[in-house]
Amino acid sequence: MNTPRPEPAVLDLEARAHSEHARELRLWLRLLACSQLIEKRVRAGLREHFDTTLPRFDLMAQLERHPEGLKMKELSHRLMVTGGNVTGITDQLVAEGLVERVAVDGDRRAFRVRLTPAGQTSFAAMAEQHEQWIVEAFADLPARDVDQLHRLLGRLKQSQIEINRRLQADELE
């Protein structure tokens, strides 16, 4: 019986740790490997089906959540990328008629970026397919395992938030 071989990039990622390493390190590398495998399929799907990229999808997702639009600095912060990256992506989406820049009242230099009607339609189609790809990524796991992973990762996330708060408080002292 042939066991499917992991993709080389994932094999390399998990090969960084061995049984003598802390189980937390092995878990971290496993989480990264899973994330990279899913993201790889999503990136390929966005490129193949919508001729777009994950960063463009992510920017449009932020704008979809904020119909009034977001300032460039807010977009940069939410996407955790530089202002230059946001400007480049926004320029492309403006040229394609998917987003627009709208002047902010009372501030001649500031603009909000928001989806156009065409952008809303385009993003809705992408978001529907994106959700399906994510559902498919977990299709081999029973629902109870997905629920358990969700709970456990929620606990991990909360733990990390608390650790970050403590670290920031220590830095202020």
How would you label these PLM feature ranges?
Residues W28, L32, Q36, M80, ...:
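Short amphipathic alpha-helical segments with heptad-repeat character
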Residues Q36, K40-T82, E96, Q168:
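N-terminal helix-turn-helix DNA-binding core of bacterial DNA-binding proteins
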Residues M1-F50:
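N-terminal leader segment of winged-helix/HTH proteins
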Residues N2-A15, D91-R151:
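Charged, amphipathic alpha-helical coiled-coil/dimerization segments
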Residues R26, D58, D147:
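Active-site phosphate/pyrophosphate-handling residues
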Residues D147-E173:
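Exposed, interaction-prone assembly regions rather than primary DNA-binding/catalytic cores
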